[in-house]
Amino acid sequence: MKKTFIILCLLVMCLMTIAQTPCPQVIPALQEWKGAKGTLCLPAQGSIVINPSDEAALTKTASTLVEDLKELMGWEYTITTGKAKKNDIYLSLSQPDEQLGKEGYTLSIMNKVSIEAPTTQGVFWGTRTLLQMLHHQKAKLAKGTTRDWPEFPNRGFMLDVGRKFFTLDYLKEQIKVLSFYKMNEFQIHLNDNGFPQFFDNDWNQTYAAFRLESERFPGLTAKDGSYTKKEFTELQRMGMEYGVNIIPEIDIPAHSLAFAHYKPEIGSKEYGMDHLDLYKEETYQFVDALLDEYLSGEEPVFIGPDVHIGTDEYNKKEAEQYRYFTDRYLKYVASYGKTPRMWGGLKWLPGKTPVQAEGVTVNAWSFDWVDPEISIQEGYKLINTCDTYLYIVPGAGYYREFLDHQWLYEKWTPWMMNRKQTLPVGTPGVLGGMFAVWNDQCGNGISQQDVHYRSFPAIQVMAERMWKGDNQQTVPFAEFEALCKTMPEAPGVNLLGRIGEETSLLTEEATLNGKESIETSLQEVGYPYTVSFSICPEEKPNISGVLFKGPHSTVYTNWENTGRIAFTRDGYEFAFGSFILPVGQWTDITIKGDWKGTSLYVNGKLQERLEGRKKRVYNPKYNRLESMPIQETLVFPLQYIGDNINGFKGKLKNVKVLQE
């Protein structure tokens, strides 16, 4: 009897196991999943139903979900209020839940989809999970219930837009990407400068930029790319709608050459013009007025809860005055009701002058510059931004081109503050982590999409580690990496230029008269790719005639009347200098691109590779030669063949695109 009972129990357990659906594959992985039997097939036309009492709080979330379902699935959904029916998507706020906190949610898939959370933020995160499930499972959703919440409250990405301009559209797409992976902070580093050795060792010629419109200081704003106050405020509002806190950073008193260019008298004569002079009253008057311009008034420009004042890498000789300056501006920002943030620097600049700690958040970025244990003892809140593990500096040759995704996935946690200090799990004051992209090499040719190629996989793995926390890995890294490669960047975002299968854009011969274009089915193709075509230019081609054009780049023939093939993007120009395209005859051209460079093949043979060119300079500070590698890359434009104003004149055929 006992043996029979045991066998029956085992059979029941097996049947239960078979009946339960496996945990859906999403990034970050779910904290809990209780599978049920069967699947739910959502219709292509359906309803998002909001609990009537939550209509005001959840209508924007529902509207965003409608847009995303259209982008991701091609579905048409409408928004209603009331009681949900079969196959509906139901959104509702629930009672406070200590485990779910401010960002957690419950998602149930039975005869309908129900997303409930104590906060609007939690409901929104639930919609991101649903979208990822739909991407993998299409209309057939595995039934079950998840309770999901983040292990760390602050999960972020910092982008240096001071040394390299990024368009407003790019920043908006980054918000969508971060949100899709439940990363909730986007720090925008608004001012910085290059290294003088690359600009004839002349501070007056050294590149520097401040990216915000300023009415108090006309002429301060960078001329090669900036954001109006209205644009930046709207960007922050968009971030709030997507659950992403935009953290503006105005970096002072170092990295401040843009301000010294505008007002030379506040630049330091002793330590370099990128350092503000901490002993001049004019310096404080300027910084007071600059910060006040964005923090004051009934409708301030900076509308979020946090404002970053930089404070990193000032000369060590001025520790006491630096500490006074830092203390002053932490309190100054706090006086406007904001939470001030700073880069850690008090270990490198120790002294007797007290620096405000209460209510201050510190990016713990360097073992040499910040002591996390002492910082927490003093009352600072910390965000792990360890340079050793979490810095990307494209094309520099120091720090990283790509984060070590496998090591981060398998080993890293936000408790690992630097290469020598790991805090005990659960240490109060550690808020989470943030990785950073620094564009130190001003003018090195790097593109927005080059940066995204590096940052996107980092977003995926950092999202996983900071949401999931110290909980056991869901799958081995190889499986996680494979999952990452199948995931979209976000609904409606394709900065990587993914195209899927090989595509023929133009099979039959086309003749273009220089004033017309052909729109194709693709926008662009990203790394690594091969684009091939046969081309026969007219005897008198247009000068710099557009051959291919896309949202971010353009390819030309007869560049500057030289007969060469060239391309432009991000304000840079690149030409294949070793080949002149013959007119009046057919030539087979192939262009291959990857994240390191771009190759031109002519009639099946490699003609030229754009990679490895360097700008070489002398650095008198260290008495050594230095070099800056130039990034000659191209995400190939495909949206239009030809141009309606100044296009290619001639014949074209056999346009094929392959992405590896």
What do the PLM-derived regions correspond to, one by one?
Residues E98-D274, E282, L291-D306, N439-Q441:
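Feature activates predominantly on carbohydrate-active enzymes
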